[in-house]
Structures are given as C-alpha cells and as structure tokens.
Amino acid sequence: MVHQSTVFHYESNHCSPSSRGSLCNEVNLPSSEPEQLFLPRGYESGYDYPLLVWLPQSDDAHFDLGRTMMRMSLRNYIAVVPADPSDLESCFEAIDLTMSRYSVHSRRIYLIGVEEGGGNAFRYACQNPESFAGVVSVNGQFPLREGLLGQFDRVRSLPMMLCCDEKTKTGELLNDRDVNQTLRLFHAAGGLLSMRVYRNKSTDGTQQVSLGDMVGDIDRWIMDEV
C-alpha cells in the first residue's frame, strides 16, 4: 500500500452574498437549481474564488455541505452540490449558474466526489479535462475499463487526488486490488495522481475514517495547486 504524502439551500430569490451569515433558509428547489451552495465567510465580489463541485454518493440524503466546508475552510472557496450529482449535465448547470451569480475563477474549478461520486468525478474530469483544474475522489473507484486516459495529451496534466480508507469494504468502494490497478494505470500513462491512505484508529478497527478527517488534506492539496 502506498502512502503519499454554513451553507444555504439555493432559491431563485437568493440571499445577498454580502450577508455576514452566508445562510439562507432551506427551501424546495427547482430541478435546475443546485441542491446546496456554500459562500465563504467575508465573501468579496471582486475576488475570483476557486469553486468546489461536490458529488456525494447518490443515496446519501444526509450530505451536509455546510458542515463539510466548516471542517475544510470557511474562507477559501465557493462550493456547490448539483441537483443531480450523478448527471454530467446537472453538474455543468450548477457550475454555470454559480459562475453567473458569484465571483468564480474559471480556471480553478475542482470536482470532489465521495464513494460512488468519486468515480463520477474521475469520469467527468477525464471526459472534460479542459473544464476542471483538478479532481478528488474519496473512496471512489477510478473507472478502469472506460479508457478514460486514452486522451493522453489532454488528461495527463490534470491533477488528481485519491483519498482512501484502508478499511473500506469491497463493492462500490475501493479495495486493495482497485488501488493497485489504479496506481499501475497512472504510472504507465504518466498521469498525475496523488494518494492519501488513512489508517483507522478506532478500537475495533471496523469504523470507516470520516470525510471530516480527510478534508484538511484535500484543502492543502488544492491550495498547493492554486
């Protein structure tokens, strides 16, 4: 194993980003609107912020963007969860809408996927490498059999990060074979892949490492890229 080293729910009549709280009330959203949007504390319209596009797994109705960003950074990023994280068009709609309303650096857009969403993040980024500055997968498999690194000249310079818990289960999550195959693929293709492997510190060793324990490393990796 290799070791390398408050949100608001969107509404059409949205709150002013100059509001100190950066919070709006939770509402029922039109399908074209992002599911959740996070503005950094002290948002300044004259500064172009990196945009983080979060892709939680499709059955995770409890993903809390605000809590996640509080653990990651309150000031560095704008962040959004698309209305349908499993749909590429929905992802780009969320990006376009956020860029039309807030100050986003068009060359600093990062995909961050969790488990199943991590595979989608790899997929979307490799299919559209010019649209993203980097991609992070948390316990999500790289789609090994889709030829995503076939567009070698376009994809090999795209920074990618894989965060994995050594205790993840097989199935939709990573296992040792997935990790080894992914490392061999990137080595052969000359792709840019940074990996973090997290050791479980629980007493019985069965509980997975939480996303909150990983976001600090993701923040540092992105800021190094910026």
Per-region residue spans from a language model:
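Alpha/beta-hydrolase fold active-site loops
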Residues: 50, 76-77, 133, 158-159
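Cell-envelope and extracellular/periplasmic
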Residues: 56-57, 99-102, 114, 125-126, ...
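Primarily recognizes the serine-hydrolase "nucleophile elbow" in alpha/beta-hydrolase
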Residues: 107-155
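Extracellular/periplasmic catalytic domains that process cell-envelope and extracellular macromolecules
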Residues: 44-47, 71-74, 104, 153-156, ...
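A domain-start/cap signature at the N-terminus of enzymes
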Residues: 1-50, 180-185, 193, 209-220, ...
